[in-house]
Amino acid sequence: MPNFFKFHTVIERHWQKPYPVLSFLLKPLSGLFAKIAAKWRADFLSGKRQSEKLSVPVVVVGNIHAGGTGKTPIAAALVSGLQEKGVKVGIISRGYGRKSKAVYVLNAASRAEDAGDEPLLLFRKTGAPTAVGSSRVEAGRALLAAHPELELIVADDGLQHYALQRDVEIAVFPAADTGRTDLDLLPNGNLREPLSRLESVDAVVVGGRAADGFMPSEHLFGSRIEAGAVYRLNRPSEKLDISTLSGKRVAAVAGIARPQRFFDTLTHMGIRLDQTVALPDHADIFNRDLPPADVVLVTEKDAVKFSDGICTDNVWVLPVCAIIEPDLAEFVLERLEGVPKAV
């Protein structure tokens, strides 16, 4: 794992600031990937490959990047917005990082190893019925069988899962990439589909402030992340007074796509970090990963990975939420021509 993690770190740095030698080696592979990705989508659109439709409308929230776009808070905000408008909404996802590929409907006792960290976080934050499965179609069917009252399904990270027909497509795009001209497809870059794909989605949500002139879609939404009050993992009602951290050893642990963003957020909040630990995205967290510190800060996504066997008395969680403008939930319902009804 350490060697793979080191290699993956080099590649991720290359994606952000390309190394000429790596670009020379990887560019031909990106050209091949582009052809494969284009044919894959074309086969579904033409009917050469079979796609299936669920009995309720499906809204896909995904991206053309290989992770790290801040999609999960956007999906949570959309689901919450739909719930506030009275829509009975469910969530389906693949469930990266879990132990099984079988379809699984989440419940109050679900763990990250059963459902994956992101679906479990969405389930706990929104309370929306949630199912995971490598086949989004099967996950959707299982969810509707368990919750026939649902009127709409949000498919988390399903933009490239063309086997599932969708009624609305929403792509999340990081603000840091809105002004770049050196983006490329995998493996030379971190795009799963070309930028032109954004022209065919219903809406693009930019995570942060977009560069001037970035207008890939007629319907462009802005978003920002707001941090909530830090709470103790094993006693969520207990909040952390940041002013009390003076003189204490403080560490931060993150197993997300871009851990430095989490560390920077804590620093901007006025928290001095004595140690940071960056783990691979979706990685399990064990006692050995927690540094010796008076306070260990983690993300919400990592918090759901903690099991009963891990000492968590000194672990605190930073919750975040996405603010999307204008109203994305309202846009979705207008796109669907009113509140959908289950059949």
Curated annotation (Swiss-Prot):
GO terms for cellular component: plasma membrane. It catalyses: a lipid A disaccharide + ATP = a lipid IVA + ADP + H(+). Disulfide bonds: none annotated. Its EC number is 2.7.1.130. InterPro entries: LpxK, P-loop_NTPase. One of its GO terms (biological process) is lipopolysaccharide core region biosynthetic process. One of its GO terms (molecular function) is ATP binding. Pfam families: LpxK. Keywords: ATP-binding, Kinase, Lipid A biosynthesis, Lipid biosynthesis, Lipid metabolism, Nucleotide-binding, Transferase. ATP binds at residues 65-72. Pathway: Glycolipid biosynthesis; lipid IV(A) biosynthesis; lipid IV(A) from (3R)-3-hydroxytetradecanoyl-[acyl-carrier-protein] and UDP-N-acetyl-alpha-D-glucosamine: step 6/6. Belongs to the LpxK family. Transfers the gamma-phosphate of ATP to the 4'-position of a tetraacyldisaccharide 1-phosphate intermediate (termed DS-1-P) to form tetraacyldisaccharide 1,4'-bis-phosphate (lipid IVA). This is Tetraacyldisaccharide 4'-kinase. The lineage of its organism: Bacteria, Pseudomonadati, Pseudomonadota, Betaproteobacteria, Neisseriales.
